[in-house]
Amino acid sequence: MEKVDVKESAVGREMRIRKQWNEQNIFEQSIQNREGAQSFVFYEGPPTANGLPHVGHALGRTIKDLVARYKTMAGYKVLRKAGWDTHGLPVELGVEKQLGISGKHEIEEYGIEPFIQKCKESVFTYEKQWREFTESIGYWVDMDDPYVTLKNPYIESVWHILGTIHEKGLLYKGHRVSPYCPSCQTSLSSHEVAQGYKTVKDLSATVKFKVKDSENEYFLGWTTTPWTLPANVALAVHPNMEYVKAKQESHVYIVAKERVQEVLKENYEVLSVHKGEELLNTSYTAPFPMKEVTNGYRVIAADFVTGDSGTGLVHIAPAYGEDDYRVVQSEGLSFLHVVDEKGEYTEAVPFLKGKFVKDCDVDIVRYLAKEGLLYHKEKYEHSYPHCWRCDSPLLYYAGESWLIRTTAIKDTFLQNNDSVTWYPDHMKHGRFGKFLENMVDWNISRNRYWGTPLNVWECESCDHQFAPKSIAELRKHSTKETPEDLELHKPYVDEVQVCCGKCGGTMNRTPEVIDVWFDSGSMPFAQYHYPFENKELFEEQFPADVIAEGIDQTRGWFYSLLAVSALYTGKVPYKRVLSLGHVLDEEGQKMSKSKGNALDPVDLVDKFGADALRWALLVDSAPWNAKRFSERTVLEAKSKFVDTLVNVYSFYVLYANLDEYNPKETYDVKLTKLDEWVLSRLHSTTKKVRTALDDYQFTNAAREIAALVDEVSNWYVRRSRNRFWESGMNAEKAAAYETLHEVLVTISKLIAPFTPFVAEDIHLNLEGSSVHLADYPVVNESLLQPKLEAEMDAVLQVVELGRSNRNQHSLKVKQPLAELVLLEHNENDMDWESYRDIVMDELNVKAFHVELDETKYTSYQLKLNFKTAGPKFGKNVNAVNGWLKQLSQEEVQNFVSTGRAVYEATPEGEVVVTGEDVLVEKVAKSGFSNTTNGQYTVMLDTNVTEELLQEGVAREFIRAVQEYRKQLNLPVNLRVDIILDTEEELQRTLTNHKDLLEENLLVKQFTFGHLTNEDDELSLGETKLRIKLSAAN
């Protein structure tokens, strides 16, 4: 075995392992070795390479890698194809910034073709950094053959899907109100909108709409979007709600009966009550009469009007509201559009022309006040949608879009979701299920440039539509020969014209590109160029057994995968979804570069190593919970887990090499109870870890492993050290080596999916082969000893209580004590005699015994709980307290047993004192200290005799010399001679314990003499001494 370099950094170790993986193609071998095995399928959600990875990506990649490695070691064939999401507005915006241009007009001036070329160049800006990050974190995924959404084969598969949807009559062109980003100048789909809501404070206005031909009657309408008022064409009421005409000062206001108090507040008189239907068709004067409307400015009925907020009357602007548009269409009213594609007012609103509408709320309100049409204004906090790409507030615009009729197969969506297992499970019928319940048709088209072109050609003459499902089909119907290397992007596909199969006219492609979420949602099919190639491979890799991404993908990739698959095949594309929570900063705030609280995962890997980062992300909390995260979290993972394991591994290799122990040879072994215990713990942990991993409970699995490693290090190895230090190779020493070897090799396999680098380092050195080509450990039931584990757990509890007891009384473990008494509070069949020596050695006591009668070592004190007793006993409270203090121990014990006592000396007669009135304190017998956990109480005799004190000094001396040996970097098995220069009293103490010193310090000769200032000095409490240490002859 190679010597373990304990000074090697985590990053150094990981770089060395990565080099070995690359040189020996371990990743490729891990897949090839499972050829012919059952497939386990997972899909890689494609990141964009025009932005750098963040800590959330580290979590996602860690989870996906863990699952893939575990399933591979469990016997499955797991293909891992990387992917890149390369289209969309983020790319366009980045290129615009790079070119110093802004908006569609300037893009077209620059030229579509050169702009598209720039987009292609920019999408892999950070590919090198992504590859390095992916490899450095240990995520095994095939980045040499990724699917790329901009490539022709991928787009052709997307076209096949869209062509099939069109063939089914589910893709249509419609006029409707859609969410629109004025900054990006394109519409968005409902699932995109759902990703960008923010809580904001906007100016709201209650507006006076003057009833036509009346002197002083007004409808009151309330709006949180005053900018839409210039486009008002109607007011809506609910026909079945009651409305009042109420006089306030010289005006009469019409408002919903249930809102009148909230709106008018005071000093009003209700004149009459009317059903909403009585108000229908009442005309009013437009508040902004700047553009003629032929049919409008009257009251209409709408079932979406409620009395929950506002005035019970809704201002209707059909160009900017979905409900508004629908009701105006059904009423046949006029349509008024006063905003351009940049979100700025047109000449229809002359005094605000060219201004961004969301900046004009104050201007609108001022205008209304000036015209005497403002009843009330106030700031209103509400949730408002913002663009998920550029963060601009969205507007709702009426216009033509291409839509997919998802609502037509809503039942399929819901049934497919019912078959999926969600982690966490509340997502299924909660956040995701409710989104499906309320979904609308998918707005698939985008009026942009860099994206998959929508493959619909329309006839100039007869409006016939043609949606080719392949390049070959497009070529077949093209009016002229198309290039062999036709690129499926704008402007190249726009140059292809098709002959109309219906009238023989010319067909041109509709100019839009598609929603990028449709691109990524098509990846199960398009990654293999299905159905044009790889049919068998596709069928083997569909559906996914699991997908895992951040919770923000609930209405993103999770939805688009489900939707595309349902529309195309009717089938569900995945069996399980792991919806990962956000990684937050220490204060629970979302990380962002602008706030300065973002952690760079690359920096964390460079500083602490990928194993530590992965472990920190996994052991902290379940991955679907939002987690507070910091550098300290990673540092703790490194020190408490990774470094602890490396120290155990280093210890084993060091002593095995010294003893020339070879695990492949056969030795006479005699397993101790400690060996049997650790093997049982190893296999019971294996059982729990496999169960947890099979149920995707990664944190539970990690915590089981962490507990095992801690016990191996701080209990098994520490309790076995003397066996490793013995000279020669007896049966018990061989058993210790054999046991620790099995423990380390098995742990390396258990942790391989979690911390792949340190796992590989251990397994490679101990077994000579890659752990990632090994099978995952299987429990050996014959080694399980639950009774032994329970007994050792009891011992560990007692030892922990003893240490806690010593800490509380400032008694170092090196200081021997006379006695430990164990009080058991629950009867069990624990054989404490078998563990006597362990407890005495661990807690450094000279005697140990178990006592069932705790009254021999403890007594109770009763104090009145004034918080509860004060109100109960009133003026008698002090008398009752005094009475409690003078009770005999027998009376106190009786109260503790029964929880009841009667005090009869009050003027009012007897008083009943119960358990809730009293604080019970357990007091140790004089000379003893006690610590309890409810199950056990540990009593320590704290009287330190002179003899015990001297032994404590000798043990402190041993500790100091052992530290000194470490500083000198002496081999652990080197026998030494020691010369000591110190005061006579310490000489006597050390001489009296010479055997103890020689046993623990590998001392051959121990003498006292005069040393010079050139020799080293040690501190032993207040005492200074000089020491000379040399190799023994």
Swiss-Prot record:
Q: What class of enzyme is it?
A: ligase
Q: Which UniProt keywords apply?
A: Aminoacyl-tRNA synthetase, ATP-binding, Cytoplasm, Ligase, Metal-binding, Nucleotide-binding, Protein biosynthesis, Zinc
Establish whether keyword Ligase is in the entry.
yes
The prosthetic group or cofactor this protein requires is: Zn(2+)
State the EC number(s).
Answer: 6.1.1.5
One GO cellular component term noted in the UniProt record for this chain: cytoplasm
Which residues bind ATP per the record? K593
Supply one GO BP term.
isoleucyl-tRNA aminoacylation
Residues forming the motif 'HIGH' region are 47-57
Query: Which SUPFAM superfamilies would you find in this protein's record?
Result: Anticodon-binding domain of a subclass of class I aminoacyl-tRNA synthetases, Nucleotidylyl transferase, ValRS/IleRS/LeuRS editing domain
Q: Where in the cell is it found?
A: Cytoplasm
What PROSITE patterns is this protein classified in? AA_TRNA_LIGASE_I
Q: Where is this motif: 'KMSKS' region?
A: 590-594
* CDD domains hit by this protein: Anticodon_Ia_Ile_ABEc, IleRS_core
Q: Which GO terms describe its molecular function?
A: aminoacyl-tRNA deacylase activity; ATP binding; isoleucine-tRNA ligase activity; tRNA binding; zinc ion binding
Catalysed reaction(s) here are: tRNA(Ile) + L-isoleucine + ATP = L-isoleucyl-tRNA(Ile) + AMP + diphosphate
Q: Which Pfam families match?
A: Anticodon_1, DUF5915, tRNA-synt_1
| Domain statement | IleRS has two distinct active sites: one for aminoacylation and one for editing. The misactivated valine is translocated from the active site to the editing site, which sterically excludes the correctly activated isoleucine. The single editing site contains two valyl binding pockets, one specific for each substrate (Val-AMP or Val-tRNA(Ile)).
Q: Hey, which family's this protein in?
A: Belongs to the class-I aminoacyl-tRNA synthetase family. IleS type 2 subfamily.
Matching entries from HAMAP family are given as: Ile_tRNA_synth_type2
Subunit details: Monomer.
**What is the stated purpose of this protein?**
Catalyzes the attachment of isoleucine to tRNA(Ile). As IleRS can inadvertently accommodate and process structurally similar amino acids such as valine, to avoid such errors it has two additional distinct tRNA(Ile)-dependent editing activities. One activity is designated as 'pretransfer' editing and involves the hydrolysis of activated Val-AMP. The other activity is designated 'posttransfer' editing and involves deacylation of mischarged Val-tRNA(Ile).
Cite the NCBIfam families for this sequence: ileS (TIGR00392)
Q: What is this protein called?
A: Isoleucine--tRNA ligase 2
Q: Which organism is it from?
A: Bacillus cereus (strain ATCC 14579 / DSM 31 / CCUG 7414 / JCM 2152 / NBRC 15305 / NCIMB 9373 / NCTC 2599 / NRRL B-3711)
